[in-house]
Amino acid sequence: MSQAALVTGAASGIGRAVAQRLEEDGMDVLAVDLQPDPDGPGTPHEADLTGTEANARAVDTALERFGRLDVIVANAGVQHVAPIEEFPVERWELIVSLLLTSPFVLAKQAWPALRDSGAGRFIAIASAHGLVASPYKAAYVAAKHGVVGLVKTLALEGAQDGITANAVCPGYVRTPLVERQIPDQARAHSLSEEDALEQVILAPHAIKDLIEPAEVAGVVAFLAGPSGRAFTGAPVTMDMGWTAR
């Protein structure tokens, strides 16, 4: 029987690349998204993961469809950029629910299946912002730091059952989420969009380039496979030298 994976935020960007790569590697994939792509990789599953029950149902759906669940990739994300005094509380709550509470509920619901796998893998797509901060991103930075703490805890809890838990921490990736940040950053910093990309988005990168989604998917595939068994409780950085500063 093939291994099975659940990938959130799977209709575009990093999640789509991860779902495609894991499927190419022979896994059955439940591709979870608020607006799933029926023509995309994996089996599409619609879910609003800001709700606790939707996360639990997604795990149950994967188990019902595939009969097992070996890999969770918690990738779904959203961003909001604003100074703290202008940051809407409702956006804080939405971001934290999707970026931090959703991975927690997925892990909680899937834990028995990951244990039964014998080599369960929990992989969160965190960010360089799980290790360092930038202004105007209070909710995102707080949630991503929380995800790094979550995988460290899961790694310790899962060690005796062969479960690993890691957080992939990329810099800026060429995704719709990053592209949507450019006008927000331009407004927040009173810059043109072109200058916002050069001076803000890529400023932390020692290598001045965006990361490709397929590159992140390659790291996820490694962590999900047998060669990744020594990695657990780790923030796995791939940030173009951002956190080397």
How would you name each of these model-derived features?
Residues 107, 143, 151:
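Active-site helix of classical SDR
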Residues 127:
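Residue(s) in the substrate-gating loop at a strand-loop-helix junction
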